[in-house]
Amino acid sequence: MVDVGKWPIFTLLSPQEIASIRKACVFGTSASEALYVTDNDEVFVFGLNYSNCLGTGDNQSTLVPKKLEGLCGKKIKSLSYGSGPHVLLSTEDGVVYAWGHNGYSQLGNGTTNQGIAPVQVCTNLLIKQVVEVACGSHHSMALAADGEVFAWGYNNCGQVGSGSTANQPTPRKVTNCLHIKRVVGIACGQTSSMAVLDNGEVYGWGYNGNGQLGLGNNGNQLTPVRVAALHSVCVNQIVCGYAHTLALTDEGLLYAWGANTYGQLGTGNKNNLLSPAHIMVEKERVVEIAACHSAHTSAAKTQGGHVYMWGQCRGQSVILPHLTHFSCTDDVFACFATPAVSWRLLSVEHEDFLTVAESLKKEFDSPETADLKFRIDGKYIHVHKAVLKIRCEHFRSMFQSYWNEDMKEVIEIDQFSYPVYRAFLQYLYTDTVDLPPEDAIGLLDLATSYCENRLKKLCQHIIKRGITVENAFSLFSAAVRYDAEDLEEFCFKFCINHLTEVTQTAAFWQMDGPLLKEFIAKASKCGAFKN
């Protein structure tokens, strides 16, 4: 859970103000500005206000939070900031707002006048639903829901991707190699830009003096170029530091390239890399990576919840990933980055009181208050009939009819394993699933049998994070068997992206004939067997 109190600037707020925060961002050259959103969707800013980056309509700094009336109720979804700084955000409705430093037209309004208050960015974006924004030092990018990318602002190294080095005063669609391709993620270094496609390909453009584009050379690129060295993997997340880049694949593999003055690549030395290198090879599967164009710090979180950091950490050069005691990558930047900015828009949850949901969670498997027990594999799980009836249609029918189970104090379960059934009952109390990927297939089977559609989605999410070349086809088969369409499509795409390796696994050849034929036919339709 993110604790905004780890950022020094938030010590200016009262406990009541801290308790109201649901989203937040710390930015600025000295981490001296902050924006936060409260639980009733009011937006506040405070801090130094350099270059009017607070958007308050004046150039006055403030230690007391000021409300940005124009953004209240807008439901901020994505936020980024530059070095000026300028601030860029998009709302859940896909609308983009910008303010602050504008010396290079990075606000996208066609001028170089500083923006003293949030103003909607309209040119070429008015009819687009923007789902993500990203900022370099003085350039901006926006990703639309249809996969198109727009860029504007400072373009001295080609970071706008227009094919020239002329500054771009308004949003311009990035084309060339990205034409008719669908981008699903964007990131900016100081003067470089990166994009991830829906098929896992990675493209980069802009400044490449440190090899941060991963192209095997250090020549600047005025238009997007594919990172060919990653052709054998499928990337699903990319982040940029000041002059380095990290990429995370769908198999949980982490790659790094670019500047390495502070060890931010995690390779064990300080040599720059012009091409991607696989790091954290001996660690467990990585599920999240973090970096920020303002800093030379890198962080990663593994499937087991372990958080690692490396690079510039409080003045030290950490050249290998170092295991921390943090629970999230955000804490690394709060405590060790220079400046101590946030690498993304923070989402905050609070535990300052016991909610109804938390009370229910506390009573799961509590013999003191339970009125029913399940016995699975000789082990007992204590539950409450009322909770089961409220949360599950299957149990509502069981306890409101003439089923024999309605009169029992102990119910035997033999069709599911203890870990699976316990995870299911715990889900009814907590609305979350705590189960390793290898057991999630059994829970997916249970969710299908009990018609628990939301639980099916949670199982699919867990399974997706645990997919590997070895189990991909088995998971595809399970998805088909349990009518999990989203998981089926995900597993199918994974198999296609790793077709050679998947077809050499035992799971592939152990599949029954009809399913194998169906897979081959579908793969053929999407061009998997083209020369």
Curated annotation (Swiss-Prot):
Start and stop residues of the RCC1 repeats: 40-91, 93-145, 147-198, 199-250, 252-302, 304-356
Keyword Transcription regulation part of the UniProt annotation: yes
Pfam family, one: BTB
Gene3D superfamilies: Potassium Channel Kv1.1, Chain A, Regulator of chromosome condensation 1/beta-lactamase-inhibitor protein II
GO biological process, one term: chromatin organization
Tissue-wise expression: Ubiquitously expressed. In the retina, present in the nerve fiber layer and to a lesser extent in the inner and outer plexiform layers (at protein level).
One Gene Ontology term, aspect cellular component: cytoplasm
Compartments reported by the entry: Nucleus
Top-level lineage group: Eukaryota
Keyword Transport part of the UniProt annotation: no
Annotated BTB domain residues: 370-437, 470-499
Sorted UniProt keywords: Cell cycle, Chromatin regulator, Disease variant, Nucleus, Repeat, Transcription, Transcription regulation
Predominant cellular place of this UniProt entry's protein: nucleus
InterPro entries found in the cross-reference section: BTB/POZ_dom (IPR000210), RCBTB1_BTB_POZ (IPR047996), RCC1/BLIP-II (IPR009091), Reg_chr_condens (IPR000408), Signaling_Regulatory_Domain (IPR051625), SKP1/BTB/POZ_sf (IPR011333)
Disease involvement: Retinal dystrophy with or without extraocular anomalies: An autosomal recessive disease characterized by progressive retinal dystrophy, chorioretinal macular atrophy, reduced cone and rod responses on ERG, and decrease visual acuity. Extraocular anomalies are variably present in some patients and include pulmonary fibrosis, sensorineural hearing loss, and endocrine features such as goiter and primary ovarian insufficiency.
Protein function: May be involved in cell cycle regulation by chromatin remodeling.
Protein name: RCC1 and BTB domain-containing protein 1
Organism listed in the record: Homo sapiens (Human)
Gene that specifies this protein: RCBTB1
